[in-house]
């Protein structure tokens, strides 16, 4: 059961709701949004009488939701949630870009270069990769110490320039470093989506998050993980899509993005960096447009993986998407 407080509900009114929940033998989970606070009642809901809560001061409505994602659901809060990072608002209906930091870049030079990018223009934030691994078995492994030192230095220079920085982590042991470098956003790779300890730790933070699903996950996995984080109190969640299985490798998960957009109110990021390599045959601009129309309001791009033009007649397709038939 979800109790939605009014926009200007006071702390005293919130305590009144919590008191009634506890008197019924239930426990509460609180999620504080920018405009409204949601209170989840956890326990045997057979003792729950919605009208007794609707009569309390400060309560806007009570919603009985049976799905596994409740705090983040459209039933609890129909309007889109907004996540604000250094005065930049994510999720308000305009497309924004999060851009991977290029090797050797400095923030101001990267911004000047990105502003001339004909595909997506100036990024709203940069993504640092202090824990990047070599995916190819015979590729030289990155120097972990150097990568972390560079990420810290980059973060400090970005802050001096007023540019938000996200830090990508892949497991719970890396969270402390990301917090230590004062990242504006914690970007959690799909590897950690179903890590319960990670979900609980993220929920206790007061830091914006990008919570990613990988090709091995379902959209339901995505929403359940976000709900676990929200139940711990952190409502600053952006859903991140790292693709779905395709015939030639991961593809943009248009169906998953559309499903999540319909089911929950959280902003959605589509990682199109893996799909803008030459063998994808779609430009970053085209992929971003597809993602935006599916429901994503943020895209992650990689300036070092530029799109090559198709060699045959300008025809384009994407791995996992059928090529249009010739007439």
Task: Walk through the language-model features, giving the residues of each.
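Catalytic beta/alpha-barrel core
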Residues: 6, 127-129, 142-145, 162-172, ...
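Short, acidic/polar
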Residues: 49, 106-117, 170-176, 283-288
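Short acidic amphipathic segments
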Residues: 50-65
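N-terminal amphipathic alpha-helix/helix-capping segment at the start of soluble metabolic enzymes
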Residues: 69-105
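Active-site mouth loops of central-metabolism enzymes
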Residues: 93-113, 166-168, 274-282
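Glycine-rich, proline-tolerant flexible connector loops at the mouths of alpha/beta enzymes
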Residues: 123-149, 303-308
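Alpha-helix-loop-beta-strand connector modules within alpha/beta enzyme cores
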Residues: 138-167, 201-208, 257-268, 313-327
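Catalytic alpha/beta core domains of metabolic enzymes, predominantly
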Residues: 194-306, 318
């Amino acid at each position: 059961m979800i109790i939605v407080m009014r926009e200007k509900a006071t702390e005293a009114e919130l305590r009144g709701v919590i008191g009634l929940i506890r008197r019924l033998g239930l426990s509460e989970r609180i999620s504080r949004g920018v405009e409204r606070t949601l209170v989840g009642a956890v326990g045997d809901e057979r003792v729950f009488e919605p009208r007794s809560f609707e009569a309390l001061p400060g309560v806007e409505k009570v919603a009985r939701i049976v799905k596994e994602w409740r705090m983040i659901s459209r039933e609890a809060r129909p309007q889109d949630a907004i996540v604000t990072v250094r005065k930049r608002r994510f999720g308000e209906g305009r497309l924004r870009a999060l851009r991977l930091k290029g090797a050797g870049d400095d923030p101001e030079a990267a911004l000047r270069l990105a502003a001339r990018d004909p595909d997506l223009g100036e990024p709203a934030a940069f993504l640092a990769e202090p824990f990047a691994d070599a995916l190819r078995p015979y590729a030289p492994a990155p120097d972990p110490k150097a990568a972390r030192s560079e990420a810290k230095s980059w973060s400090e220079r970005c802050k001096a320039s007023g540019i938000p920085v996200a830090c990508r982590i892949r497991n719970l042991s890396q969270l402390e470093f990301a917090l230590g470098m004062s990242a504006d956003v914690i970007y959690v790779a799909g590897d950690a989506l179903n890590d319960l300890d990670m979900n609980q730790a993220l929920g206790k933070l007061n830091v914006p998050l990008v919570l990613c699903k990988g090709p091995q996950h379902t959209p339901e996995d995505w929403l359940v993980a976000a709900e676990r984080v929200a139940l711990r109190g952190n409502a600053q969640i952006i859903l991140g899509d790292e693709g779905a299985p395709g015939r030639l490798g991961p593809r943009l998960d248009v169906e998953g993005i559309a499903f999540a957009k319909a089911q929950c109110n959280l902003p959605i990021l589509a990682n199109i960096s893996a799909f803008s390599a030459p063998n994808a045959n779609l430009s970053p601009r085209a992929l971003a447009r597809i993602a935006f129309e599916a429901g994503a309001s943020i895209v992650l791009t990689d300036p070092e993986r530029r799109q090559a033009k198709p060699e045959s007649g300008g025809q384009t397709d994407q791995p996992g998407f059928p090529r249009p038939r010739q007439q």
